[in-house]
UniProtKB/Swiss-Prot annotation:
Name of the protein in its database record: Golgin subfamily A member 6-like protein 26
Disulfide pattern: none
UniProt biased composition (Basic and acidic residues): 25-46, 80-94
Annotated keywords: Coiled coil
Residues in coiled coil: 151-644
Keyword Coiled coil belongs to the record: yes
Disordered: annotated segments: 1-94, 300-330, 358-440, 455-572, 584-620
Family per record: Belongs to the GOLGA6 family.
Biased composition (Low complexity): 10-23
InterPro entries: GOLGA6L
Biased composition (Polar residues): 47-57, 65-77
Length: 649
């Protein structure tokens, strides 16, 4: 509720109090109210003229000319009682008119006082609003400090976790390097994959260079925005303080003008009315300026909200990056587990190979024992076949020495068998039958070898298909990565366009700020002129006690404004400190982003090494398969030799 000041009542005017006009009231409402008040006064006083000074001058002329008027004087210069009554009646009427004019002026002055009081009330209300806004700013600053502390704690925790992860990754890299050295000795790298990797690395380097340039542009734009942020709040506070001072000075100027009007009211009524109109126009201009300032404040609040939203988005981006890092770490763990499993498979295969080798040695020993027994039996049973046994011994020694030259040994066996046919013509038929059986067995062996070769070809084809499928998958992954990179580039282009728009807006704001500064300078010059006038008026105001009270109130208000300015300065200092802290936090965030980039590069290198190791493991597995096939072939050949020997015996 607005306060209702006490006004003096008039018997002819309505008794309701004059409600104050709101500072946002339009010109038409005030003009209409003033016109109604004037009409009421003229209706109740029809005898008064528009100018009171003329009526007073007429009465003086009548007083002077009373002695010279032939109608009112006698021939002897004596006044009749009727003339004296008329003169006294006229004199009373003139006095009444003067009193009514003075009452009218007093009422106008009281109305002006009420308006001035209401203006002071509104200024005090605005000061209270500013105090509330300052408190809100302080609370926001406290909240921002708390949020900054939480961010620092989170950043420290993330830094410790990253250090641990880096140490663990370094240990893993050392182990992997050792394994890679061992694998390089046993494997041969593919040239086509190297060329593809080189091309992809070149593409990645180009993309990273473009990203670094974009980041530098973004940083420069952020710095510009921070500078604009630093300039805007200071200018707002100064502008508000200047406006309050100007309002107070305008109020004091109005009061002094009213005092001067009271001293010269009887002579300058018309000038006072003109001044009232001018003052009303000035008030309306002030109201318009206040509206413009409120709109500017709203725009600045919207900008601050947008900046807060940007900060929140940046925090969300940081959270997303941390989640990506966690996912990458999980992928690294999975790859390490795969490597361990592959190593275990390799150990198992090596153990199997060792077991097979041991079995081969045992079989060789058994064969040697059997051959020795056969030789002993041959010596006991057949003394005549000593020459043949010696030849068989030679053949067995050759088989032991050269396992790979089994075919040559078979030819020698044929030659030896032919010699045996020449020596033993009696057993030709039996030997022919044995030869036919040997031919059949050899055909069977050849068929088995062909079957084994077909199986090997099938295995190789399956491996080739698997490799082709893996290559297709890798190519699909590469296509997906290229599409993602293109999407990121499009996003970066969009961000650059937005940043350019923001720069244009900032330039427009800077131009507006410069215009405001020029206006403020002009207003300060006007204020200096007004202060000089106020010095002259204060000497006159010392005579009036009422005006002194008003001056004391104004001084109290000025002290409050000074206190508010000091508080605002303190708030500005706090804001500067907070901005410095925010800058430090942003620098920390930039350093963390650089570390994240380095870690991503390391992860890419590790993934490439893992791929190379997997290829080497695949090659080793293929070699193991080939070795197993060879061992099987050797075992079959050894069995065939044993059968030949048994048949020959």
């Amino acid at each position: 509720m607005w306060p209702q000041p006490h006004l003096p009542t008039h018997p002819h005017l309505p008794t309701h109090p004059h409600l104050p006009t709101h500072p946002m009231m339009s010109k038409e409402t005030r003009q209409s109210k003033l016109a109604e008040a004037k009409e009421q006064l003229t209706d109740h006083h029809p005898q008064t003229n528009p100018s009171v000074g003329t009526a007073a001058s007429d009465t003086k002329k009548k007083k002077i000319n009373n002695g010279t008027n032939p109608e009112t004087t006698t021939s002897g210069g004596c006044h009749s009682p009727e003339d004296e009554q008329k003169a006294s009646h006229q004199h009373q009427e003139a006095l009444r008119r003067e009193l009514e004019a003075q009452v009218h002026t007093i009422r106008i002055l009281t109305c002006q006082k009420t308006e001035l009081q209401m203006a002071l009330y509104y200024s005090q209300h605005a000061v209270k609003q500013l105090e509330g806004e300052a408190r809100d700013l302080i609370s926001r600053l406290h909240d921002s400090w708390k949020f900054a502390g939480e961010l620092e704690q989170a950043l420290s925790a993330v830094a410790t976790q990253k250090k641990k992860a880096d140490r663990y990754i370094e240990e893993l890299t050392k182990e992997r390097d050792a394994l890679s050295l061992e694998l390089y000795r046993n494997t041969i790298t593919d040239e086509e994959l190297k060329e593809k990797n080189a091309k992809l690395q070149e593409k990645l380097q180009l993309v990273e260079s473009e990203k670094s340039e974009i980041q530098l542009n973004v940083k420069e734009l952020k710095r510009k925005l921070e500078r604009a942020k630093l300039l805007l709040p200071q200018q707002q506070l100064q502008a508000e303080a200047d406006h309050l001072g100007k309002e107070l000075q305008s109020v004091s100027a109005k009061l002094q003008a009213q005092v001067e009007e009271n001293e010269l009211w009887n002579r300058l009524n018309q000038q006072q009315e003109e001044k009232m109109w001018r003052q009303e126009e000035k008030i309306q201009e002030w109201e318009e300026k206040i509206q413009e300032q409120e709109e500017k404040i709203r725009e600045q609040e919207e900008k601050i909200r947008e900046q807060e939203e940007k900060m929140r988005r940046q925090e969300e981006m940081m959270w997303e990056k941390e989640e990506k890092m966690r996912r990458q770490e999980e992928m690294m763990w999975e790859k390490e587990e795969k490597m361990r499993r592959l190593e275990e498979m390799m150990w198992e295969k090596e153990e199997k190979i060792r077991e097979l080798e041991e079995k081969m040695h045992e079989q060789e020993k058994i064969r040697e024992q059997e051959e020795k027994r056969q030789e002993e039996e041959k010596i006991r049973e057949q003394e005549k076949r000593q020459e043949q046994e010696a030849k068989m011994w030679r053949q067995e020694e050759k088989i032991r020495e050269q396992e790979e030259k089994i075919r040559e040994q078979e030819k020698k066996m044929w030659r030896q068998e032919e010699k045996i046919h020449e020596q033993e013509k009696i057993r030709e038929e039996e030997k022919r039958q044995e030869q036919e059986e040997m031919w059949r067995q050899e055909e069977k062996i050849r068929e088995q070898e062909e079957i084994w070769r077909q199986k090997e070809k099938m295995h190789e084809q399956e491996k080739i298909r698997k490799q082709e499928e893996k290559v297709w998958r890798q190519e699909e992954k590469m296509h997906d990565q290229e599409e993602k990179i293109r999407e990121q580039e499009e996003k970066m282009w969009r961000q650059e366009e937005k940043i350019r728009e923001q720069e244009e807006k900032i330039r427009e704001q800077e131009e507006k700020i410069r215009e405001q500064e020029e206006k403020i300078r002009e207003q300060e010059e006007m204020m200096q002129e007004q202060e000089e006038k106020m010095g002259e008026q204060e000497e006159k105001m010392q005579e009036q006690e009422k005006m002194r009270r008003q001056e004391e109130k104004i001084r109290e208000q000025e002290e409050k404004i000074r206190e508010q300015k000091e508080k605002i300065r303190e708030q500005e200092e706090k804001i500067w400190e907070q901005e410095e802290k925010i800058r430090e936090q942003e620098e920390m965030m930039q350093e963390q982003e650089e570390k994240m980039w380095e870690q991503e590069e390391k992860m890419c290198e590790q993934e490439e090494k893992m791929q190379e190791q997997e290829e080497k493991m695949r090659r080793q597995e293929e070699k193991m398969w080939e070795q197993e096939v060879r061992l099987r072939q050797q075992e079959e050949k050894m069995q065939e030799h044993q059968e030949h020997l048994e048949a020959a015996i």
